């Protein structure tokens, strides 16, 4: 048998099953102008998290009678805000046909319970307009500035004591997230600060989602689908090549490189 024959028998690819956690944008109304405004507000609160985010566009909850959806325009709105649509979830024939015309995969409607991602509004409030007195009226005394409450000694920490199952999404706004149990494939942990997992970490862990490059990820057993700090990430295919796979590790960010070290 020649060398060429041996090379032909050597497989150049493998088909593997995988459970990936993907963000779902569930459209409630066919109003692209309003979607553009609201999406811009969300992205402004966590720009690093929404950068090149893979997305499933769910159209199966759209109410009847809202008119034909302009799918190319909808995808362009998402693209402008860094959301990359991988597939469409739909049940209506016209939506399925529109997706197929764009060569987009179509997923069937889902009956699973999906938790919304709660990103709190961090935009500053507009100052109140100054009211000027009319001529002859006494000028009111300036209001005394309100005393601001003392800053907390530490950032708030969210503690989860039960296993985090596939499809669940937990977000620690403004602080750290501590999980005292296992995290299953398909689960997603997000925190503005650090993430600690005192058990096997098999889902996705995204720390510093608002851009904190000093955030860290700690876990007792690294088997994650994805780890990310301030928008810099590694997926399971990269993580499995690390000698730290399956071990207790500490993940930190140096420049734009994720470092994984043993605990």
From Swiss-Prot:
Keywords: Cell cycle, Cell division, Septation. The keyword Cell division applies. InterPro entries: CAP/MinC_C, MinC, MinC_C_sf, MinC_N, Septum_form_inhib_MinC_C. It comes from the Bacteria. It holds the Pfam family MinC_C. PANTHER family: SEPTUM SITE-DETERMINING PROTEIN MINC. Cell division inhibitor that blocks the formation of polar Z ring septums. Rapidly oscillates between the poles of the cell to destabilize FtsZ filaments that have formed before they mature into polar Z rings. Prevents FtsZ polymerization. This is Probable septum site-determining protein MinC. The gene is minC.
């Amino acid at each position: 048998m020649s060398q060429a024959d041996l090379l032909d028998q050597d497989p150049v690819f493998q088909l593997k099953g995988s459970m990936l956690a993907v963000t779902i944008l569930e459209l409630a109304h066919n109003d692209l102008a309003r979607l553009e405004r609201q999406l811009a507000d969300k992205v402004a609160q966590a720009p690093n998290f929404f950068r090149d985010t893979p997305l499933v566009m769910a159209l199966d909850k759209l109410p009847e009678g809202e008119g034909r959806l302009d799918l190319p325009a909808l995808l362009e709105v998402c693209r402008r805000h860094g959301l990359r649509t991988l597939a469409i979830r739909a049940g209506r024939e016209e939506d399925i046909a529109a997706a197929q015309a764009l060569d987009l995969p179509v997923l069937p409607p889902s009956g699973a319970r999906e938790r919304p991602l709660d990103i709190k509004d961090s935009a500053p409030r507009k100052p109140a307009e100054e009211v000027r007195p009319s001529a002859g009226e006494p000028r009111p005394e300036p209001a005394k500035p309100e005393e601001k409450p003392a800053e907390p000694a530490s950032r708030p920490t969210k503690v989860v004591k039960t296993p985090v199952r596939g499809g669940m999404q937990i977000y620690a706004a403004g602080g750290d997230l501590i999980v005292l149990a296992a995290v299953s494939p398909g689960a997603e942990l997000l925190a503005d600060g650090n993430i600690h997992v005192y058990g096997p970490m098999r889902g996705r862990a995204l720390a510093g989602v608002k851009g904190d490059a000093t955030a860290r990820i700690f876990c007792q057993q690294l088997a994650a689908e994805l780890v990310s700090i301030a928008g810099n990430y590694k997926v399971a295919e990269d993580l499995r090549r690390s000698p730290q796979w399956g071990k207790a590790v500490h993940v930190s960010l140096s420049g734009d490189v994720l470092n994984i070290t043993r605990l």
